[in-house]
């Protein structure tokens, strides 16, 4: 839930107007909107490279995944792995745009561990791929923007622990 929605829900629950502090937080959120959109645009524009390089780094670190019997062995399974990495990058951009983890949580992380366990896919490999993408994505951004994006990658990774 965004800071705007949270503030309104809280104020309404108490049958009051928004406080000066709440209005200041909403103002800061609105003013940071263009920056968040720029970060999401950079990640979106570079998504193919981020996913491809992230996958390559993952497969170099975790050769068991692409070896015979591994979950990403063969072209089709490798493509499936890269598709999943792309999905998590997309979720991160949703969080950045919203300025909140709710889209990440509600759209993509509910039951993630259970799903991968049921498929026999090591969640540690998926998490390593997301970590690789985080490093690549954050290298494309300035310090403050990198920290902003890093927060949403870290949130995603936390759900995989």
Curated annotation (Swiss-Prot):
UniProt membrane topology term: Peripheral membrane protein
Xref: Gene3D superfamilies: Phycocyanins (1.10.490.20)
Keyword terms: Antenna complex, Bile pigment, Chloroplast, Chromophore, Electron transport, Membrane, Methylation, Photosynthesis, Phycobilisome, Plastid, Thylakoid, Transport
Residue numbers bearing the N4-methylasparagine modification: 71
Binding positions for (2R,3E)-phycocyanobilin per the UniProt entry: 81
Pfam families, alphabetized: Phycobilisome (PF00502)
GO terms classed as biological process: photosynthesis
Post-translational note: Contains one covalently linked phycocyanobilin chromophore.
Gene Ontology, cellular component aspect: chloroplast thylakoid membrane; phycobilisome
Superkingdom of source: Eukaryota
Statement: the UniProt record of this protein carries the keyword Membrane: yes
Family annotation (SUPFAM superfamilies): Globin-like (SSF46458)
Keyword Transport appears in the UniProt entry: yes
Disulfide cysteine pairs (residue numbers): none
Protein's cellular compartments: Plastid, Chloroplast thylakoid membrane
Function: Light-harvesting photosynthetic bile pigment-protein from the phycobiliprotein complex. Allophycocyanin has a maximum absorption at approximately 650 nanometers.
Subunit and partners: Heterodimer of an alpha and a beta chain.
Family from the record: Belongs to the phycobiliprotein family.
The protein, known as: Allophycocyanin alpha chain
Species in which this protein is naturally found: Aglaothamnion neglectum
Protein's gene: apcA
């Amino acid at each position: 839930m965004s800071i705007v929605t949270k503030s309104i829900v809280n104020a309404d629950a108490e049958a009051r107007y928004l406080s000066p502090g709440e209005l200041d937080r909403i103002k800061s959120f609105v003013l940071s909107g263009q920056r968040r959109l720029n970060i999401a645009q950079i990640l979106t524009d570079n998504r193919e490279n981020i996913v491809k390089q992230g996958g390559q780094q993952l497969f170099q670190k975790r050769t068991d995944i692409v070896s015979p019997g591994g979950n990403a062995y063969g072209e089709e399974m490798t493509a499936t792995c890269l598709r999943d990495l792309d999905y998590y990058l997309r979720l991160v951009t949703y969080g950045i745009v919203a300025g909140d983890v709710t889209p990440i949580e509600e759209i993509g992380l509910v039951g993630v561990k259970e799903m991968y366990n049921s498929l026999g896919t090591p969640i540690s490999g998926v998490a390593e791929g997301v970590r690789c993408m985080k490093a690549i994505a954050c290298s494309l951004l300035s310090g403050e923007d990198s920290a902003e994006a890093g927060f949403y990658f870290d949130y995603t990774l936390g759900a995989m622990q």
